[in-house]
Curated annotation (Swiss-Prot):
One GO CC term, this protein: proton-transporting ATP synthase complex
Ligand binding (ATP): G169, D170, R171, Q172, T173, G174, K175, T176
Family according to the record: Belongs to the ATPase alpha/beta chains family.
Keywords for this protein: ATP synthesis, ATP-binding, Cell inner membrane, Cell membrane, CF(1), Hydrogen ion transport, Ion transport, Membrane, Nucleotide-binding, Translocase, Transport
One protein family per Pfam: ATP-synt_ab_N
Site feature Required for activity, where: S371
Subcellular location(s) of the protein: Cell inner membrane
Domain of life the protein comes from: Bacteria
Catalytic activity: ATP + H2O + 4 H(+)(in) = ADP + phosphate + 5 H(+)(out)
InterPro entries: ATP_synth_asu-like_sf, ATP_synth_asu_C, ATP_synth_asu_C_sf, ATP_synth_F1_a_nt-bd_dom, ATP_synth_F1_asu, ATPase_a/bsu_AS, ATPase_F1/V1/A1_a/bsu_N, ATPase_F1/V1/A1_a/bsu_N_sf
GO molecular function, one term: ATP binding
Name of the protein: ATP synthase subunit alpha
EC code: 7.1.2.2
Amino acid sequence: MDIRAAEISAILKDQIKNFGQEAEVTEVGQVLSVGDGIARVYGLDNVLAGEMVEFENGTRGMALNLETDNVGIVIFGADREIKEGQTVKRTRSIVDTPVGKGLLGRVVDALGNPIDGKGPIQATERKRVDVKAPGIIPRKSVNEPMATGLKAIDALIPVGRGQRELIIGDRQTGKTAIALDTILNQKPLNVEGAPEGQKLYCVYVAVGQKRSTVAQFVKVLEEQGALEYSIVVAATASDPAPMQYIAPFTGCTMGEYFRDNGMHAVIIYDDLSKQAVAYRQMSLLLRRPPGREAYPGDVFYLHSRLLERAAKLNEDHGSGSLTALPIIETQANDVSAYIPTNVISITDGQIFLETDLFFQGIRPAVNVGLSVSRVGSSAQTKAMKKVAGKIKGELAQYREMAAFAQFGSDLDASTQRLLNRGSRLTELLKQPQFSPLKMEEQVVVIYAGVNGYLDALPVAKVRSFEDGLLSLLRGKESAILDAIRTSRDLSDDTAAKLKAVIESYAKTFA
């Protein structure tokens, strides 16, 4: 066997040339102190604001305070396992979350990890949780309705796709119930094979709620067949403050996927008061200076940058939309507190719920006088505009008169008539939970109310009159509902037919 020296040297040279020194360079720091879910770390000089870092035991955190000699990190998890002197390494990625249709029907935590025991998430894309809102040029004014299925809201405080409508009220006034009914009302739009432009996907973000409450909510969605077009993001009361702070942003990013791909979504933040409290806790522990009510100075920016991401995009950007329904809990109906006034000024209107109305049996307990929708009326259908214009005026007069009527017993006939009509319209706007009405059904019911067909009835009979009329129109006279649904208008011809049907029904009902 002949071994040539030249060959050997050539092979050696080649191997030396191709010798790759695989070295992983990671930037690490050291934990200086840890406590209350906050870690102070020394040595992460190049860390980015909002970057994910990893502790020795695999717990993750987010760098929030970048100071001269150390970094303040909020911990996404328990801080019991983290000790002084442990190493922390950079991940070189800003906090992100999985997005896409693979999340529909799932319950995830604030970082997008599944918590429903149904296996891993089938999502290929990941997006940053905190991104800049769309500018002015890609936007379009709100022009399509986002139906909630509730007469009181769709007629008087209409919400459009791409709008931000605040739901505000004390505890136990039915805020979450309105949100739940809105999700259930989208079921007919999300049927299999429906065009994407019609569908409305739902994202529900639970912040600081009891686990039992969230489980109950998910159970209702499942039973009603609404979970398949919904995503639930849960950061419960037992989760650390950073999770409660980041959850709304995570949910928003999931909703933005639909908005940016020419689809439509609605996101419900339940509720932002608890997110503000979590943010206040983090800020104070990071030793940021407190402001009014001990909230940090940038708590307005916290909510504005979140809610500005809800938008209706124009045709050049796919015509998608993201509607936001933030919920705020007030203390003793105090709308002038810091967080409520902030969010009222950011949103395009508010639905104000009152405890007194709730206990009077007016449910949904919407105070029609204080509630407004600043942009929704341009999204209302023509049919609804025609009937709802009257009901607004009648109810406003009724509220004014009812206040005066308490003082005097001898009222003239016109005032008496106004009070009678008002009390029946108020009764008409009541609606039990889980029974949303389609737009055309709301139109015919309100038409009957504003045209005086309920005036002769006792108030207690209004509900049964409404139910009977609707079952008649859904059955024998379904052509009227079909005409309103297809034209989205109440033509003179349809109105005449409707009038005849209501009149004949009123005679038999009496």
